[in-house]
A protein has these predicted regions:
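Conserved RNA-binding domains used in RNP assembly and mRNA/RNA metabolism
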Residues: 1-87
Length: 87
């Protein structure tokens, strides 16, 4: 099941990278919003765009946790992928 999920997540990541859309990656305790700059074998890297930082927010409270210039997350930790509308 893990390999199949990772393959689906990776397919979505490549689609967002291809169109250059801002993406939201949901992980168990937080989510991150930004633009994909690199999809590696096990990690995906997001960067800020248009002068805004990568947004890292708590899933429980929605509170901002940090605003780094870029962040890398492990693909196997990603629960879901979405656009940034309404996130």
């Amino acid at each position: 099941m893990g390999i199949q999920k990772d393959t689906k997540i990776r397919t979505l990541l490549h689609a967002f990278e291809l169109v250059g859309a801002r993406v939201v990656l949901f992980l168990p305790s937080f989510h991150v919003e930004g633009f994909i700059t690199r999809i590696g074998e096990t990690f995906v890297t997001l960067r800020r765009g248009n002068g805004a930082g990568v947004e890292v927010e708590s899933n429980d409270s929605g509170q901002a946790l940090e605003n780094p210039h870029q962040i890398s997350v492990k693909i196997s930790d990603i629960i879901s992928v979405s656009d940034d509308r309404g996130a």
